[in-house]
Regions:
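Walker A (P-loop) ATP-phosphate-binding motif of ABC ATPase nucleotide-binding domains
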Residues: 37
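Residue-level signal for inorganic ion chemistry
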Residues: 7, 43, 64, 130, ...
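A conserved segment at the C-terminal end of the G1
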Residues: 40, 48-65
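Conserved catalytic-core segment of NTP-binding enzymes
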Residues: 134-139, 146-200
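Charged, amphipathic alpha-helical linker segments immediately N-terminal to NTP-binding catalytic cores
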Residues: 1-14
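Redox-cofactor binding/interface segments in oxidoreductases and associated redox assembly factors
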Residues: 9-12, 26, 131, 152, ...
Length: 200
């Protein structure tokens, strides 16, 4: 099985938790510690917000890695440095390096893809990485990083069956990317508890 087909075959293995992604990053030498990270979550608009933030950082002179999902045509769209998708030869080489560790840890598609992006950014010497949260926030693979900025675009009714059953429950999950003492931005027009992380 070719490397990309192997990665796609890991779809459907979703099981909430950060244990696998943290163990995978440890096996890879903690690439996520090589640069500052901004996490962008929310129900809608997080991809656009992540791309805009990456463009602002690039304009300011930073070498920027951008990780988004899903892709439109090509998987390589998800992992970009300076607006350019990861080259195919580098993608295949990193997948071959990642594969034995991901298999041993039974990592999911998104966990493996996230680790792949973080490793690529470290190898490419990025000065800042912008990561779009996949689903929710608290238990999302991107949340295995320690962000210097966390953004939640909004809190909506999408994915109530997974993150719900209420907007307050969704807000708690999305607020999971916030850290004490770390700048946080939120633009949530829907009613949200003032401190969703503390709501019973």
């Amino acid at each position: 099985m070719d490397p990309l087909s192997w990665l796609y075959a890991r779809q459907g293995r979703f099981a909430p938790g950060l244990e696998r992604i943290r163990a995978l990053l440890a096996r890879l030498g903690h690439p996520e510690e090589a640069y500052p990270v901004a996490l962008v979550g929310g129900t809608n608009g997080k991809g656009t917000t992540a791309r805009t933030l990456a463009a602002i950082l690039e304009e300011a002179g930073f070498r920027v890695g951008l990780y988004t999902s899903p892709h439109l045509v090509d998987f390589r769209e998800r992992i970009q440095v300076q607006g350019r998708p990861i080259p195919e030869e580098k993608l295949l080489a990193l997948l071959a390096e990642l594969r034995p560790h991901a298999e041993r840890l039974e990592a999911s598609f998104f966990e493996a893809a996230t680790a792949l992006a973080l490793l690529h950014f470290a190898r490419e010497g990025v000065e800042f990485a912008v990561l779009e949260v996949g689903l929710g926030g608290r238990l999302d693979a991107t949340n295995a990083t320690e962000p210097v900025l966390s953004v939640v675009t909004n809190v909506g009714h999408d994915h109530l069956e997974v993150l719900g059953p209420t907007l307050q429950a969704v807000a708690r999950e999305e607020a999971g990317i916030f850290r004490g003492g770390v700048p946080a931005l939120a633009a949530a027009p829907a009613p949200v508890p003032a401190n969703p992380a503390a709501t019973p």
